[in-house]
C-alpha cells in the first residue's frame, strides 16, 4: 500500500501536537490536553438536562473516598481525551475499541507514574459507579425502566466485591451542579496538581 493510501490513526490535540493512536508515546501525553478535551466532552452522549463534562465527572470521582487512588480516579477516563467518550453499550459491540483504549491508558499510566491497568482497579470502578448513580439521578430524565438499570449497577458493585448499600448521602456530590467547560478544565488541572504533587511526595 502506498504512503498516499495508508490509513492514518493520528489525532491533533489542543496543544497542536499529533498523536498516533496506534503507537502513542508517554512524551505525547500532556495533562493540559487531557483537561481541555475532557472539559469539552459531554457525559451520557450529551443527553443530560444541562451540559455536563467528563472532566467534572472525573474531578468528583477523585473526591469519593479520596484517601484511596484519588489520582487514578481523576485520570480513569483520560483516554477519552484522545478517542472520545463512547458510551458503554457501543464499546461492548467493538472489542477493538477497548483494546486501543487499554493501550492508550497504559501509556497514560507511564506518563504519570501509575500502575498499568489503574483504570480497572475495583476501587476506581466503585467511585465511577457511584458517580454514575448520582449523575443519572440528577441529570437524566426519569424513566420507569430506570429500576432495571439500577439493578444492573448494583450487580456490578457486588461483582467488584462491594456492598450494595451505597453512601450516596456522604460523597458530597448532591445537589449536582454542572460546571461550565472553563471551570471544569481549571478544576481538573488544580486537582491534578494537588494529587500529582502528593503522589511524588510519597515516593
Where are these regions (language model features)?
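Metal-dependent phosphohydrolase cores
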Residues: 1-203
Amino acid at each position: 500500500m502506498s504512503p498516499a493510501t495508508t490509513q492514518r490513526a493520528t489525532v491533533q490535540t489542543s496543544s497542536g501536537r499529533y498523536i498516533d493512536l496506534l503507537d502513542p508515546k508517554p512524551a505525547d501525553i500532556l495533562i493540559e490536553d487531557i483537561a481541555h478535551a475532557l472539559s469539552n466532552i459531554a457525559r451520557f452522549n450529551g443527553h443530560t438536562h444541562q451540559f455536563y463534562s467528563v472532566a467534572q465527572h472525573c474531578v468528583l470521582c477523585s473526591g469519593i473516598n479520596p484517601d484511596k487512588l484519588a489520582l487514578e480516579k481523576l485520570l480513569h477516563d483520560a483516554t477519552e481525551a484522545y478517542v472520545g467518550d463512547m458510551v458503554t453499550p457501543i464499546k461492548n459491540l467493538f472489542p477493538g475499541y477497548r483494546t486501543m483504549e487499554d493501550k492508550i491508558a497504559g501509556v497514560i499510566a507511564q506518563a504519570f507514574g501509575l500502575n498499568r491497568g489503574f483504570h480497572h482497579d475495583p476501587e476506581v470502578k466503585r467511585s465511577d459507579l457511584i458517580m454514575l448513580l448520582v449523575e443519572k439521578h440528577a441529570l437524566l430524565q426519569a424513566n420507569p425502566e430506570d429500576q432495571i438499570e439500577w439493578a444492573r449497577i448494583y450487580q456490578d458493585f457486588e461483582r467488584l466485591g462491594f456492598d450494595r448499600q451505597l453512601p450516596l448521602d456522604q460523597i458530597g456530590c448532591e445537589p449536582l451542579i454542572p460546571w461550565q467547560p472553563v471551570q471544569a478544565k481549571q478544576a481538573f488541572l488544580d486537582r491534578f496538581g494537588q494529587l500529582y504533587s502528593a503522589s511524588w511526595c510519597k515516593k
